[in-house]
Regions:
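Active-site neighborhoods and metal-handling regions in enzymes and metal-associated proteins
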Residues: 1-191
Length: 191
């Protein structure tokens, strides 16, 4: 509280470099009261205040490989709807992680996530892709969409990233990184 989005982005860049990142070419730091209006945006001079949700996303590199990772932070106490939406995003993400294994058509990851969102948030405005591959590029195939019948393969690295616009102009996203192994998904991110 008291710092601007830009201040937080600078501090995060310093921290990432001090922990070994080679570069940070992608770092949206976005805030908004009760949620954010968009997730792909440059940090601004907007000062963080109580009641805000702070969305941090990074596409940092190490040894030529990208990570793609986001988190949401409530400044002060989050509202009930924000807590509820975040919990549903967590459930949707977990449901996708649990079914991810070699041979699974990618659209099934999308389906399990959209079904989770629709079950608990029937009036949501979710659409688009809910994750993608990454590695040598920040965004690589496959895209986790409703119509992608490509099958998961061992050693694919994916971001599982459901998002929901839970009311007009208010969005939350939850993201986890996984690698596909013979027996299922291995979580790469810390929870």
């Amino acid at each position: 509280k008291g710092d601007s989005e830009r201040d937080i982005a600078k501090k995060m860049k310093i921290d990432l470099i001090s922990r070994g990142a080679d570069s940070i070419p992608y770092l949206p730091v976005i805030s908004g009261e009760g949620g954010v209006s968009q997730i792909i945006y440059e940090p601004s001079s907007r000062v963080i205040k109580n009641g805000d949700i702070l969305f941090l996303d990074t596409g940092s590199t190490f040894d030529g490989y990208f990570c793609d990772f986001d988190r949401n932070y409530a400044i002060g106490k989050a509202s009930k709807i924000v807590n509820d939406v975040y919990e549903v995003l967590w459930i949707a993400t977990q449901n996708a992680i649990e079914i991810a294994k070699p041979g699974l058509p990618i659209y099934k990851l999308w389906s399990v996530m959209i079904n989770s969102l629709n079950k608990y948030l029937p009036n949501n405005f979710s659409k688009g892709r809910f994750g993608h591959g990454f590695g040598l590029q920040l965004t690589e195939p496959p895209s986790i969409t409703f119509d992608n019948d490509m099958k998961l393969e061992s050693n694919m690295v994916l971001t599982i990233e459901p998002s929901v616009e839970f009311k007009p102009g208010k969005t939350l996203v939850h993201e986890e990184n996984i690698v596909i192994k013979e027996k299922g998904a291995e979580l790469l991110t810390s929870r």
